[in-house]
């Protein structure tokens, strides 16, 4: 199998090579490119541009079109995979994305050419779940409001939720819409606080 990888400032070429090494057979070959700028700040702006629909306007690494001509598998992170690139790879069987979103990949073109596209939706799921818990605590305990008031010399005593007793987490019922990788982690973390959890997910018969 011929594998072509395109790393970047976030998922580097070294990371890709090290990650693939345990799974390679003796007949597998790997060609690795580096996409974009080594500065993550620059790449963050480029990612936003790609996600906003600018996929076709970004140049891919030199030599990538030639490399995919006989490739079986293409692995990318932020590098755009356009219709033109897919059509230059007649033997391509699958495109794997190291990120959750697929905005940088022309999924429709891949589908038309019978190329499987897979992503990694759980790669930052725990970070998102932790951030969600943080927001719940900040909102219910008025942490941000208190901080803002103190910075402005005010000792605030009332908040939007002080009309009734402010509930502790253990007394809360929390509804979660969507029970995928992130939803499950949020539910688990909330259960440690003692919350009652209600879940709604149209894709699951029973949660």
Which residues does each PLM region occupy?
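Phosphate-binding beta-alpha-beta segment of Rossmann-like dinucleotide-binding domains, i.e.
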Residues: 113, 121-173, 185-188
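Generic structural signal for helix capping and beta-alpha/helix-loop junctions
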Residues: 13, 40, 104-105, 127, ...
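Glycine-rich NAD(P) Rossmann-fold beta1-alpha1 loop
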Residues: 100, 122, 180-184
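Rossmann-like dinucleotide/phosphate-binding beta-alpha-beta segment
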Residues: 162-207
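Positions that flank functional sites
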Residues: 83, 125-126, 205
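Alpha-helical elements of the RecA-like P-loop NTPase motor core of helicases
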Residues: 14, 83-87, 130, 144, ...
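An N-terminal-biased, well-structured beta-alpha scaffold segment characteristic
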Residues: 1-116
């Amino acid at each position: 199998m011929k594998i072509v990888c395109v790393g970047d400032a976030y998922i580097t070429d070294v990371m890709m090579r090290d990650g693939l090494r345990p799974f390679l057979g003796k007949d597998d070959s790997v060609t690795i490119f580096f996409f974009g700028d080594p500065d993550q700040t620059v790449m963050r702006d480029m990612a936003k541009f790609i996600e906003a629909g600018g996929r076709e306007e970004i140049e891919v690494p030199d030599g990538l079109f030639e490399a995919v001509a006989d490739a079986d598998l293409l692995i990318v992170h932020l590098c755009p995979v356009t219709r033109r690139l897919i059509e230059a790879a007649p033997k391509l069987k699958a495109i794997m994305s190291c990120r959750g979103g697929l905005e940088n990949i022309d999924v429709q073109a891949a589908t038309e050419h019978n190329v499987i596209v897979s992503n990694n939706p759980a790669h930052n799921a725990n970070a998102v779940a932790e951030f969600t818990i943080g927001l719940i605590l900040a909102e219910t305990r008025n942490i941000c409001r208190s901080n803002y008031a103190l910075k402005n010399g005010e000792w605030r005593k009332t908040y939007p939720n002080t009309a009734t007793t402010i509930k502790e987490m253990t007394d809360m019922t929390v509804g979660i819409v969507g029970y995928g990788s992130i939803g499950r982690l949020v539910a688990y973390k909330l259960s440690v606080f003692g919350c009652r959890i209600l879940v709604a997910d149209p894709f699951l018969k029973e949660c």
